[in-house]
């Protein structure tokens, strides 16, 4: 069972009574066939639920009102099977607060050249019915997605499925609670921001809990629970000699297990699905939570270090979006560079907290080593390299008057040499279009040093995310040229200034 099983998407057909009862009967019959086929064959993440035809303003408004108040409804897919006068949709669309997708399709794929008549033409009017609906969306400044293609086309299935992921993610975000253990890392700017504005824009709440509250829960964990979790570690990871049963760091592993169990219990009791820590505020914890954070991220929790609640929330959002897809998604940080003409590389990592969902190894290494930051006992952590291939890094920043999402398309590569003295998980990548352009564009746009790294999602997913939340997006990819990128930032400043 996944988060998508908690939601459904309503399939709404637009028509009108002008065409008579027989045409409406055929429209309903077609709709039932299409919905059944999509649910059976399209591998959509959510179930489609067919609603009664929308043939009048009152019917359409009732459907939209019901969608707003049904917690299981993640959004609406609308198909204009016949012409559906768009003034009928104004009241409904004006109150609708769920995501909307217009499926611009028709029942038949090919025209019946020898038999086509006006009855056929009147029944299958998506081509201009969809344009009428599009006009009222544009006239009302209504943000909605559009997918064109036959309902049996796999590309259309993929695009509808991707939109469904966004719709569910948006509903989950409205309920998201972010827990900050301690406050922001002292004097750091980009990790701070306006939490009230974030809740207004996205719906997630951010609040702080004292580390002492967490420590109380951690200290309440019994040996039996710790032993059971240690057994799971033994079967899931390759333990170094120091962390094995008679190793000199075995107690550190037990303490890491205690912290993991305590953190998870605290988060579950509070209904949190994202959290932050900071190494400046660990009073009462014996070690920086490394292994605990890595494993909680793999279970779907959002996380970021140094109190960075925006990145923690974004990671949770992207975890939901990518549920069930191939490839992982993790907290990440651009850590250091390899400058080599034509082969510039970025080594990404963090002190400890990189999610094993992006690991190339089936069984990462579990080790305990010294950490020179935080002044605590040596922490446990998982060490691994990252899968290769296309990926993205994304950053959500607070510009005061709006939010900006930055996305850099990257290509992760195999580490050309072993890293015997680097005791942390890491990812190595080439930034698109090249490191100088990518880094300069990122810096000019104000991108954070913390990001969400993902093999599972791509630029199209993040464009949809920005659209569905109505925020700015700045893209750095192989098509990026700095002069044009700078111009786009200036134009966005004007556009969003007028939009306020």
Curated annotation (Swiss-Prot):
Its name, as the record gives it, is L-arabinose isomerase
The protein's UniProt keywords, in alphabetical order, are:
Arabinose catabolism, Carbohydrate metabolism, Isomerase, Manganese, Metal-binding
Provide the GO biological process annotations: L-arabinose catabolic process to xylulose 5-phosphate
Report the sequence similarity comment from the record.
Belongs to the arabinose isomerase family.
Report the EC number(s), separated by commas if there are several: 5.3.1.4
Q: Quote the cofactor binding remark.
A: Binds 1 Mn(2+) ion per subunit.
Q: Which cofactor does it need?
A: Mn(2+)
From which source organism is this entry? Salmonella typhimurium (strain LT2 / SGSC1412 / ATCC 700720)
Assembly and oligomerization: Homohexamer.
User: What SUPFAM superfamilies does the record point to?
Assistant: FucI/AraA C-terminal domain-like, FucI/AraA N-terminal and middle domains
Query: What Gene Ontology cellular component terms go with this record?
Result: cytosol
Q: What class of enzyme is it?
A: isomerase
Any Pfam family hit: Arabinose_Iso_C
Source domain of life is Bacteria
- Quick one: which pathway? Carbohydrate degradation; L-arabinose degradation via L-ribulose; D-xylulose 5-phosphate from L-arabinose (bacterial route): step 1/3
Function per UniProt: Catalyzes the conversion of L-arabinose to L-ribulose.
């Amino acid at each position: 069972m996944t988060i998508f099983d908690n939601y459904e998407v309503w399939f709404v057909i637009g028509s009108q009574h002008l065409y008579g009862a027989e045409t409406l009967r055929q429209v309903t019959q077609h709709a039932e066939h299409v919905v059944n086929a999509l649910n059976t064959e399209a591998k959509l993440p959510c179930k489609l639920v067919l609603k009664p035809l929308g043939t009048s303003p009152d019917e359409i408004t009732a459907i939209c009102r019901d969608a707003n108040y049904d917690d299981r409804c993640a959004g609406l897919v609308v198909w204009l099977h016949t012409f559906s006068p768009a003034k009928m949709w104004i009241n409904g669309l004006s109150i609708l607060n769920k995501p909307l997708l217009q499926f611009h399709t028709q029942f038949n794929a090919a025209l019946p050249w020898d038999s086509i008549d006006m009855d056929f033409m009147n029944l299958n009017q998506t081509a201009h019915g969809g344009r009428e609906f599009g006009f009222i969306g544009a006239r009302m400044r209504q943000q909605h997605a559009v997918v064109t293609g036959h309902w049996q086309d796999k590309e259309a299935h993929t695009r509808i499925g991707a939109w469904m992921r966004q719709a569910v993610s948006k509903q989950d975000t409205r309920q998201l609670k972010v827990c900050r253990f301690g406050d922001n890392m002292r004097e750091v700017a980009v990790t701070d921001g306006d939490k009230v504005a974030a809740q207004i824009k996205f719906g997630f709440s951010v609040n702080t809990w004292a580390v002492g509250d967490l420590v109380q829960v951690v200290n309440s964990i019994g040996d039996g629970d710790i032993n059971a979790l240690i057994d799971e570690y033994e079967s899931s990871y390759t333990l170094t000699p120091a962390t094995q049963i008679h190793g000199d760091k075995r107690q550190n592993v037990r303490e890491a297990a205690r912290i993991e169990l305590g953190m998870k219990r605290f988060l579950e009791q509070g209904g949190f699905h994202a959290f932050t820590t900071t190494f400046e505020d660990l009073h009462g914890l014996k070690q920086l939570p490394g292994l605990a954070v890595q494993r909680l991220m793999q279970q779907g929790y959002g996380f970021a270090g140094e109190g960075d609640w925006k990145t923690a929330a974004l990671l949770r959002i992207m975890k939901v979006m990518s549920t069930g897809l191939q490839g992982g998604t993790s907290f990440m940080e651009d850590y250091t560079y390899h400058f080599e003409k034509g082969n510039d590389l970025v080594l990404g990592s963090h002190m400890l907290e990189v999610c094993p969902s992006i690991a190339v190894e089936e069984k990462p290494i579990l080790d305990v080593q010294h950490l020179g930051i935080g002044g605590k006992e040596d922490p446990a952590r998982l060490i691994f390299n990252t899968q290769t291939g296309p990926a993205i890094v994304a950053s959500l920043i607070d510009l005061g008057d709006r939010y900006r999402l930055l996305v850099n398309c990257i290509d992760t590569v195999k580490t050309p040499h072993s890293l015997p003295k680097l005791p942390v998980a890491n990812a190595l990548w080439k930034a698109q279009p090249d490191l100088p352009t990518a880094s300069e564009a990122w810096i000019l746009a104000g991108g954070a040093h913390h990001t969400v790294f993902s093999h599972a999602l791509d630029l199209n997913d993040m464009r949809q995310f920005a659209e569905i939340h109505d925020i700015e997006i700045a893209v750095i990819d192989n098509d990026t040229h700095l002069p044009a990128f700078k111009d786009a930032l200036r134009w966005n400043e004007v556009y969003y200034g007028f939009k306020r």
